[in-house]
Regions:
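N-terminal secretory signal peptides that target proteins for export/translocation
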Residues: 1-4
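Bacterial N-terminal signal peptides
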Residues: 9-19
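Bacterial Sec-dependent signal peptides at the C-terminal "C-region" and cleavage site
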Residues: 17-31
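Beta/coil-rich, acidic/histidine-enriched accessory regions frequently appended to metallopeptidases
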Residues: 27-59, 82-89, 293-297, 323-519
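Extracytoplasmic/secreted proteins, especially bacterial periplasmic and envelope-associated proteins
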Residues: 35, 39, 51, 82-85, ...
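Sec-exported extracytoplasmic/periplasmic mature domains
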Residues: 45, 57, 61, 75-78, ...
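Long amphipathic alpha-helical scaffold segments
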Residues: 76-126
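Juxtacatalytic substrate-recognition/specificity segment
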Residues: 114-237, 247-254, 267-276, 280, ...
């Protein structure tokens, strides 16, 4: 059993790397008296690339500010080699902004040197894969982009510029190189995606054991791109992250885990642990906070605040706020223009509302604070049970699992293990009862959904099976149980039963992850 911060241990870093990645207006003002570079930067972050190019054509080509603007535009259009070449000039490349752009340009060039590109010209989507084994994700990624763009247009008034660019990378080093997010920060907070430079860079689900909710993560990051376009990259971090967390689930039907645990309960626990921060003191990125616990609490704070703002304001308040940020001197000015109150005034109202929420228990399995009692012993017993399963001793494995306290079954990885053991002892009914109510799980978990789907199909409940396998694929698309809908030791089902999932099954088989206890 692995103690996992299921809700926010995998942090989606964002375009809100504001302090280190935004264009420097001070430099532009010094050697760009006509403002061509500044206007081009605004057009670039708004993804109006043709207009940005036209603006730069009017400018002095030797101006450092203009060269920086051209390098930025090239990076947004994925011409990483051109970015690096433009910044080879010493007086440009040695500026702070120039060094950052040059580093990202070189990193991007290395990562994308041998990538495979899938283009959907009809829908305006370009997906670049560092590893060809991830290409079978394309149908799921395209479907997510289309639905997320529609929901973001509905909620935020976004007019999407095409194409929407996505790069899928194989590891955190590549994620860091492509985006400028420090590798150490990505490791500390468990970052799996970054929206910056006009694209979403997404870590392959293959990089994480049993994947992660990559479809919601993609919707989250697309929200950051939408906010950057609408505000010309002038949105504060609390707005970026709060709106992205709100929107990451609005592209699909509501799910069982969308409000579990409630963000208010996480904030309350964070306050007890002194992990909370003022909304305007979050730093340049949540992905750069000192720990995953701190990131969890920060995400909960901004999510709760934006939820309160949206629910107590007119329906068009968020779209109007994004537009107001384009020209307002500060975020406070924009907020006051739209709502009549500043952030500090809203903060007082939000915290007063927060205090009215009844105290909710937060499962110790969630990950904030002290480790639950008995965790070490439970981990050892679960590992022993896995090894016994791998050698065909299911009854003995069940004996070990029965010694683990029942409250530990909130951990879905342990619940999955017990369900697999029950399957192996011909106790399908007990396994069904164990997985029947996902509300008993701490968080959504692909393998649990896969077993649930398999059991539902065996008893003839096809609708429940389809829902369960859909959830399994959304989290663990390269797991054999999710993609092939069978045990790893079983032959593949008929391909027509898998439908569009057949290529994922083939990829999962080629990956050949060992089954329980066979590592």
């Amino acid at each position: 059993m692995i103690r996992k911060r299921f809700l926010a241990g995998l942090v989606t870093a964002s375009a809100a790397l504001l302090a280190v990645c935004g264009p420097s207006r001070a430099v532009a003002d010094l050697d760009d008296p006509r403002g061509h570079a500044s206007r081009a930067n605004d057009l670039t972050v708004s993804m109006d690339y043709d207009k940005a190019r036209a603006e730069l054509a009017k400018a002095d080509p030797n101006s450092p500010a203009v060269i920086l603007a051209k390098a930025r535009l090239a990076l947004y259009e994925e011409d990483c080699d051109l970015t690096a070449a433009l910044l080879s000039r010493a007086d440009v490349g040695q500026q702070d902004e120039g060094r950052l752009l040059a580093d990202v340009g070189r990193g991007c060039a290395r990562v994308t040197a041998a990538t495979i590109v899938d283009k959907d010209d009809v829908n305006g989507i370009v997906i670049r894969y560092q590893d060809g084994a991830d290409r079978t994700l394309t149908p799921l990624l395209v479907d997510t982009v289309l639905k997320a763009r529609t929901s973001l247009t509905r909620d935020l008034g976004v007019e999407w510029k095409r194409p929407t660019r996505i790069t899928v990378v194989r590891d955190l080093l590549s994620l860091s190189a492509m985006t400028g997010l420090p590798y150490k920060a990505a490791q500390t907070t468990g970052t799996v995606a970054v929206a910056k430079w006009g694209r979403v860079t997404l870590l392959s689900p293959r990089a994480s054991h049993h994947g992660y909710p990559f479809r919601d993560t993609l919707a989250h990051e697309l929200t950051h791109l939408a906010i950057s376009m609408q505000t010309r990259d002038r949105a504060p971090l609390w707005l970026h992250e709060g709106v992205a967390r709100r929107e990451e689930v609005r592209w699909r039907e509501p799910g069982i885990f969308d409000e579990r645990p409630s963000v208010e309960s996480i904030v309350a626990r964070g306050i007890e642990l002194k992990l909370d921060l003022a909304l305007d003191k979050l730093g340049p990125s949540i992905a750069m906070l000192p720990s995953a616990d701190a990131a969890t609490v920060a995400f909960a704070e901004v999510t709760s605040f934006i939820k309160y703002f949206a629910e107590t304001s007119p329906a068009d308040a968020l779209p109007r706020l994004l537009v107001a940020l384009r020209t307002a001197k500060t975020a406070d000015d924009a907020l006051k223009e739209v709502s009549g109150e500043t952030l500090s005034q809203w903060d007082v109202r939000w915290r007063a509302n927060l205090a009215k929420h009844p105290k909710e228990p937060l499962s110790p399995m969630f990950g904030l604070g002290a480790m639950p009692p008995g965790l070490g012993d439970s981990r050892e017993r679960s590992r022993l049970a896995e090894l016994l399963v791998g050698r065909g001793h299911h009854a003995e494995a069940l004996t070990e699992l029965e010694k683990i306290p029942a409250e530990m079954l909130a951990d879905p990885s342990l619940r999955y293990l017990r369900a697999r053991v029950l399957e192996g002892t011909d106790s399908a009914k007990q396994a069904e009862a164990l997985l029947d109510d996902p509300k008993l799980w701490t968080a959504s978990y692909g393998p649990c959904w896969a077993v649930r789907g398999r059991l539902a199909r065996a008893r003839g409940d096809q609708p429940a099976a389809e829902v369960s396998f859909g959830e399994a694929l959304a989290h663990d698309p390269f797991g054999i149980e999710s993609a092939c809908q069978v045990l790893p030791s079983a032959p593949n089902p008929p391909l027509d039963r898998l439908g569009q999932g057949a290529p994922l099954c083939e990829t999962a088989r080629k990956r050949a992850d060992p089954d329980l206890g066979r590592e």
